[in-house]
């Protein structure tokens, strides 16, 4: 911890001013981030959030600031998101310059106090409100296993320590949607197994490069992109199928067994 603090203090060039908040105790990921966003957004009316495993394009701040200014008076907009989910790239040239989606991607993003003041950290309370509104199926994109509800339940039970599931649920309850761009202005380089919430994977590196030029934002109608919603629904269903299907797990075991034997045969033939 001491090394991290000293490193931060020695790398403050390029900023007009830097305020470092040092905790006496480890507040954990969720509480610490929520308190930080609350403090900054309340004081300045808006906030840009970048965690320590996020790599940004040189135009990241320009993009986020332009978005925050463009939609500052539009209550239906929850956030401006810089990260481009690789699953959206299947649309190819049909992917718009910018679009609205029913999720908040928190790997480099910005929002306003007008939105953040409605944030609810209590996941159990959020799930109760979603059920009371008769919107649980909509919240889970029609996936019968209710993966989004399960995430809130895990958080409420203390089995995970997150804050972003609550952000998405809070935005959902207030009928807010988020802006994203076809150009990636941020990327997560922490999915290498060294972090808390993500195991090693190359998924987030596929087909996505940080933008090396800026593509000026133009204000568009605030409405969900249905093609993006369809992609998210399909991929969420596939993810749940893989997680819960005995057939899928059996096929994986067979695949790894065959690959293992194949590698062993190649090794034996070379020796």
PLM regions and their residue ranges:
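An acidic/histidine-cluster motif and surrounding catalytic segment
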Residues: 1-49, 54-271
């Amino acid at each position: 911890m001491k090394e991290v603090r000293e490193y931060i203090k020695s790398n403050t060039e390029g900023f007009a001013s830097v305020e470092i908040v040092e905790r006496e105790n480890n507040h954990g990921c969720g509480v610490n981030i929520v308190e930080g966003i609350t403090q900054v957004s309340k004081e300045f009316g808006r906030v840009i959030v970048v965690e320590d495993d996020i790599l940004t394009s040189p135009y990241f701040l320009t993009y986020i600031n332009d978005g925050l200014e463009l939609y500052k008076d539009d209550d239906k907009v929850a956030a401006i998101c810089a990260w481009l989910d690789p699953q959206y790239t299947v649309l190819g040239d049909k992917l718009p310059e910018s679009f609205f989606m029913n999720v908040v991607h928190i790997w480099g993003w910005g929002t306003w106090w007008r939105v953040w003041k409605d944030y609810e950290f209590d996941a159990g309370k959020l799930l109760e409100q979603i059920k009371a509104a008769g919107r649980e199926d909509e919240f889970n994109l029609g996936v019968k296993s209710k993966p989004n509800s399960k995430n809130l339940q895990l958080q409420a039970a203390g089995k995970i320590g997150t804050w972003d599931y609550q952000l998405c649920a809070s935005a959902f309850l207030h009928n807010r949607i988020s802006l994203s761009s076809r150009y990636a202005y941020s990327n997560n380089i922490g999915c290498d197994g060294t972090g808390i919430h993500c195991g090693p994977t190359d998924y987030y590196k596929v087909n996505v490069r940080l933008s090396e030029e800026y593509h000026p934002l133009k204000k568009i109608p605030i409405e969900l992109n249905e093609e993006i919603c369809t992609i998210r629904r399909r991929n969420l269903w596939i993810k749940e199928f893989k997680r819960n299907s005995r057939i899928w797990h059996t096929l994986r075991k067979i695949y790894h067994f065959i690959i293992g034997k194949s590698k062993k045969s190649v090794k034996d033939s070379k020796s």
